[in-house]
Amino acid sequence: MERAKILVWDLPLRVFHWLLALSFAGAFLTAESERVRDVHVTLGYTFVGLLAFRLVWGVIGSRYSRFASFAFGPRAVLAYLRSLLAGRPAHHVGHNPAGSWVIYAMILLGIVAGAAGHAVYNDVGGRWLESLHEGSANAMLALVMVHVAGVAVGSFAHRENLAVAMVTGYKTGRPSEAIGGTRPVTAVALVSIVLLLWSGVLEVPSMSTGTADAATARGGDRPHSSSPSHRRGHDG
């Protein structure tokens, strides 16, 4: 049967993918700054929350979002890598075997980084947890680089822009392999929850500024901040 452009990635998966990328990049870039610790912490919780969504969506999502569609063993991964090196990579409509292992590793490292960061932020544990948090975040950065390189190689080998596919949802395949719909309601719900989380954080500076200005006008004492940024530790 002739191949054509078909819908492969549902909208919730695409929204998740790019929100996760933004959350990770933001958390990594704000990790060393005390001034934006609230932002770093919220990015970290956003990242972990998105991973939780992915775990659920990996069970109830559309065909290629489900973990069952890319549960490849070591032999399948090695066979795919050999075909890639030989210049004749096997075409997979959904995630390929090598990419699937990167996804699983990212989820695992993300959970470890999030749990360790939450513990450090709440002064639980010790220095080893901070090292675990930073180490797992650095390992994720390495995986991101592997992922980007894999997307570039796969795009060239298959003559198909895989990054664009994660925006549009369309890849090359047989019509019978297409998913039935984009699931827009779930995507809107996901974005709404993330925006709701961030609305509270973005209100904090204006509230603090207003309180400080009022105290100055009265000649009173400087208000005590209850912001989490005054706690010790890091989170991601």
Language-model segment annotations:
Residues 1-236:
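Membrane-embedded alpha-helical bundles that constitute the cytochrome b-like, heme-associated redox core
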